[in-house]
Regions:
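Long, amphipathic alpha-helical surface segments
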Residues: 1-20, 26-27, 35-39, 60-68, ...
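Short, surface-exposed acidic-centric catalytic microdomains
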Residues: 29-55
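Acidic helix-start/capping segments at beta-turn-to-alpha-helix junctions
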Residues: 90-92
Length: 157
């Protein structure tokens, strides 16, 4: 997997950073860097660091939650995507980003994309990523992720 600080930087680019609770486009109560507190509640352990999140959190608190969410997504990708560990760091990141955004079960619905990646057809996998409701909803994020899948290089443009 890519370095934690790089994953944080990229996910802040894609998700944004909000220190007060807000409703995400899907209508869920969210805070920090895309932490959906309805489906992924703040744990007691996390509350010790972030405090009363309903009143807002610090940037450090948001990054703490994000690190936990990145580790969770990475663990789920390793568990549910058999070939994940064989991918280079950038393509692992692409799947991690999608898992972070969609949840592992949302990512697993991309069967054709995942199959293409498993057999090394990264151009085909990229096309499958872009030919989806996900791509229409997240726009430039999906373009970056698809390009990363195809080329094995992440670009901030």
């Amino acid at each position: 997997m890519i370095e934690m600080q790089e994953a944080i930087k990229r996910l802040i680019l894609h998700e944004g950073l909000k220190l007060k609770p807000y409703k995400c486009p899907a209508g869920y109560l969210t805070i920090g860097v895309g932490r959906n507190v309805e489906t992924n509640p703040i744990t007691e352990e996390e509350k010790k660091v972030v405090g009363d999140w309903e009143r807002g959190i610090t940037e450090n608190g948001a990054k703490y939650l994000l690190k936990n969410d990145i580790m969770k997504a990475h663990k789920e990708c390793k568990k549910y995507i058999e070939f994940y560990k064989t991918l280079d760091d950038e393509r692992q990141y692409a799947l991690l980003d999608m898992c972070f955004n969609l949840g592992i079960y949302g990512l697993l619905k991309f069967r054709k994309m995942l199959f293409a990646m498993e057999i090394g057809d990264y151009r085909g996998a990229s096309k499958e990523c872009l030919n989806s409701k996900y791509a229409k909803e997240v726009g430039k994020r999906a373009v970056r992720i698809a390009r990363t899948i195809e080329k094995g290089v992440f670009s901030y443009d």
